[in-house]
Amino acid sequence: MFNVRDRAEHTRKRKIISHAFSPRSVAAFEPHMVDNLRRWVVQLDRIAASRPQLDEENFGRFNAMPWFSYLAFDIIGDLAFGSPFGMVNRGRDETQTQIVEGGAISYASAVEAINRRGEISSTLGLLPALRPWATYLPDPFFTKGVAAVENLTGIAVAAVASRLDAADKGIADSRNDILSRLLQAKDASGHPMGRDELIAEALTQLIAGSDTVSNTSCGIFYYILHGERNAPNTIVSRLQGELDRAIGCEADIVNYSQVKDLPFLRRCIDEAMRLHSTSAIGLPRLVADSSLGVEFDGFHFPPGTVLSVPSYTIHHMKEIWGDDVEDFKPDRWLNLTPRQKIAFNPFSYGPRACVGQNVAIMELQLIIGTLFHRYDFALYQPTMGFHEGFSKKPKECHAGIRLRNQN
C-alpha cells in the first residue's frame, strides 16, 4: 500500500488494511506486545544485575539502541507474521529468511537489511533513472542494498508461508494479530487479498512497524534522560510519580489501560517525537494532474510537481515553537497554538497518513511506561548521533540501568 501511486488502488488497499488497525483490533494486539515486553524485561534485569558492567552507583552499563531494535522487531514479527523473530531471547540481530518460497532457509540480519533498504530506497526514489542499473553498479552501497531488499522479502516469505499454508488447508487460526486481520479482510467486491499481495502487505508492516518504532522509542528514551540531565528533578521524577500512582509497585509490565490516559507520559512521548522526527526528510506528494496546481506562500506549483514537508524542519522552527525549540519541554504541550498543532506531523496527514499510528502509540506508551516504572537510568551518551536513510536512526545510546526501589 505504501508505494501505490494510483489513487483508486490505494483507496482499495487502505480500506482493506484499515480494518486490521481499528480500535477493536488494536486492543487485541496488547497481549502480544506484553509477552514480548516480558521477555525484554528479563534481559534488561540481567543487564542491570551484571556485575562486570556495574559502575560505582550500581548501574549496569549497556547500549540501549540494539535492545530497542530487538524488541520492536520481535513485536512486529509477532503481530505481522504470527511469532516473534527471537531477537530479544538471542540478544542479537538474526532471523530466518527464504529468498524463494519453498527454498532453503538461511539467516540474515533484519535490522541491517532494513537500514540498507532504507538507504537504497531513498536514493533510488530521488534518482529513479538509476533503478534499472542498481543491480549492476559495482558500488557496495548498491549491491548490498539490493541484497538487503531480497533478504527482507525472504524474511516475509519465510514468516508468512506457514500461516498461509494452514489457512489454505482450512486449519482454524485463533490468533488476533495483523496477519489474521489481513487474511479475513475483503475488498468492496468481497474478494480477499491474494497470496502475493498478503506477503507484500505483511512485508510493509515489517518495514513500517520495526525500524520506526525502535528509532522513535530510543529517541524518546534519550530525550527524557537528556531533558532530566539539563534540568534535574523536572522530568524523570514526575514521570515515575505519575506511573507509580497509576500502576503500583508490584507490576513488572504496565497495561495499556493503566498508561493510555497518563498526560505527562504522553507529553514526553510527543515532545520527543517532535525533537527526534523519525521520518525527517518528509514524504513526497505529487500535485495531481487533474488539479490546477497548488498555491503556497506566493509560489505556484503546477500539476506533476513533487512536494514534501520535511518533518524535522518544521518540528525545529523557532517561529513555530519558540526560542526554546531545541529544549525538551513536555509542558509546552499544555498550551499548543493552532499553528503548533498543525505543524506536528510525526505520522503525516491525509489519506496517506500512517495507518498503524494507533498501534505505534500503544507500543510506545507500553515501552516507555514499563521502562521508567521498573528502572532508574543514567545517561552516558553525551549527544545523540544519527544515521539518515529513509528514517532517522540513532547510532547508539549508552546508558546505565538498575532496578528501582519503589517502596
Regions from the language model: what does each represent?
Residues 26, 168-170, 256-263, 354-356:
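Conserved, non-catalytic sequence blocks in retroelement Pol enzymes and Pol-derived host proteins
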Residues 303, 309-337:
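Conserved cytochrome P450 K-helix/beta-meander segment immediately N-terminal to the heme-binding cysteine loop
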Residues 43-50, 229-235, 340, 357-394:
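Cytochrome P450 heme-binding "Cys pocket" and the immediately downstream C-terminal segment
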Residues 30-217, 238:
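Cytochrome P450 heme-thiolate monooxygenase catalytic core
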Residues 212-228, 367:
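Short, small-residue alpha-helix embedded
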Residues 34, 53, 58, 98, ...:
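Cytochrome P450 I-helix active-site segment
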Residues 392-407:
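C-terminal helix/juxtamembrane-tail motif
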